Curated annotation (Swiss-Prot):
Example GO biological process: reproductive process
Quaternary structure, from the entry: The proPCSK4 form interacts with HSPA5; the interaction takes place at the endoplasmic reticulum.
Peptidase S8 domain location: 126-440
Similarity-based family: Belongs to the peptidase S8 family. Furin subfamily.
Segments forming domain P/Homo B: 449-581
Residue ranges listed under propeptide: 26-113
Identification of the protein by name: Proprotein convertase subtilisin/kexin type 4
Catalytic activity, EC: 3.4.21.-
Amino acid sequence: MRPAPIALWLRLVLALALVRPRAVGWAPVRAPIYVSSWAVQVSQGNREVERLARKFGFVNLGPIFPDGQYFHLRHRGVVQQSLTPHWGHRLHLKKNPKVQWFQQQTLQRRVKRSVVVPTDPWFSKQWYMNSEAQPDLSILQAWSQGLSGQGIVVSVLDDGIEKDHPDLWANYDPLASYDFNDYDPDPQPRYTPSKENRHGTRCAGEVAAMANNGFCGVGVAFNARIGGVRMLDGTITDVIEAQSLSLQPQHIHIYSASWGPEDDGRTVDGPGILTREAFRRGVTKGRGGLGTLFIWASGNGGLHYDNCNCDGYTNSIHTLSVGSTTQQGRVPWYSEACASTLTTTYSSGVATDPQIVTTDLHHGCTDQHTGTSASAPLAAGMIALALEANPFLTWRDMQHLVVRASKPAHLQAEDWRTNGVGRQVSHHYGYGLLDAGLLVDTARTWLPTQPQRKCAVRVQSRPTPILPLIYIRENVSACAGLHNSIRSLEHVQAQLTLSYSRRGDLEISLTSPMGTRSTLVAIRPLDVSTEGYNNWVFMSTHFWDENPQGVWTLGLENKGYYFNTGTLYRYTLLLYGTAEDMTARPTGPQVTSSACVQRDTEGLCQACDGPAYILGQLCLAYCPPRFFNHTRLVTAGPGHTAAPALRVCSSCHASCYTCRGGSPRDCTSCPPSSTLDQQQGSCMGPTTPDSRPRLRAAACPHHRCPASAMVLSLLAVTLGGPVLCGMSMDLPLYAWLSRARATPTKPQVWLPAGT
């Protein structure tokens, strides 16, 4: 006799319930355990609580807070631990008109946040994490706060990822992965005798190698989801780069890239039109408008005296450029010095230096990963920890945090200088060694940055001979009095068109009104080009938080052959920053989850301790960009007095950056390139997000309910996974890329920034 269909379904459900959650990628869910105590809020204080306790058999254990509104009750007739609440006492309390709120208490799982050292056999070799090096990257300090990258998705754009690797498989995320070399969903690397396609797997392990599994080492964000994009193992075009950088922008939080143009000391090259558009769309629309985080290795051309300001990827304002240092704090032989580098993590130098431990091809491990290729993924993992601590950080917030969490420490260089706001900065190291503990601490208390402003100053538009040494000075108001006026700088660009008889002999510098001198490009002896720079954009981060008003000085100096000649045709100074004085901002706490005093069954906050706004699981001092604060009335049940109104953060309309309400006419500021209509209160411009509803990646594999996730996943397989589960590449861009793919493009060869 065949079992009835219902019985089959029940067996299936039971079987799924017995499957180990880790085996199918689900987070374990613990049922609440109810205890024999209650918290109650009454309107008439201790006298009413005593009457209530006598009537229903409770013991009054006294007030919870000194003001006498909340009380702790216990009932001796209720079992100490139960999987179900006591419905009888619940009904008694609910019917009592003097009880404003009550909650039967449940056991809370808490652990002491001492430093838990991973048991992975090669963790002892991870000197940059295990406190063997001093200073290390303070990874243990971040872990001791309970942070591990949970809920954060990182994708490594490289030559593929060994998705079945013993140290990666459990964290592998297929939605954050794709093969753009062969156009299929499988990013598995192509195996060769020389193991040339090991790069992506090595970088992925640095970010999210599993912890405590008895294998290899551990990743910085060992509970983050990790994906890989195979895009370097074949002919690379502008289309492939743009598609890789646009993969799942509402699902992937961080893209890590350790590649770029050739580090040969003579190349000046950068992203094409489509890739620049992908960067722009990523920071304006990615992560729900908070902005995708692009982490980039600064380059390995030090042996050829290369300069990463001649690399248009690492000197983009949209990427966070990471340099390298050795265990001893020395400049590695391959390191490039340039003004666009923001921060530094560890790698190695000479062959005898300890290197980086990570995953390797053929399910192996290696302790010989090096180059800036090794530094950028370490930074990506640390940034994943910061994003877990505060998921509402924008892409610019994160760059501000990295500036503040990077310190000179023991890093050795002759060019350390103090900029106009008192920070030390170097062309080799940016603002110094990134400290994960300081990064997450600062992230928790960070006040959202005001909208980005851009002020363009056309300084030179007529041909000017370049003498052996010339200075071009311009008194800049930083657009004072206009809607785009800037008080505190972030990125500064100098866009130059010039000719020169031997390009590599020309040193270009920029000095701010506050006296900070930044070398935009130093001499490059191997660059013998006579082409000069055609509309090339140099970028410096050395003026961060300075006031831009005053005289800016561009210096051009011949450092080589005496008879070199050239002409400067155009020079535009591009200032990016904010209207806020960042040096004067308060240091009070902004984000905290411990301030939540009441949660629902799903962990969402229902009440905060003190004047704060509720946003999901957090209590905020004020709402981040894309949200507005308001009060929401709470309907009281029959016989209950009205509960106080909740202070909450609600979503702005998609077209707004900041707002005073949820309507498209409630905007108070706009995303970059959009214009605010002051009278209408609306944003108009090309970057206004499309209002069409989109399927989100979160709707499938990371659904809050595992059963729902499985149903949606089965439907996705049946009906076409990418369509249902949120292959959320922006549709206009996807159509644009599809058309561009049919257009022949000149093949380009990019080299990984390490081995």
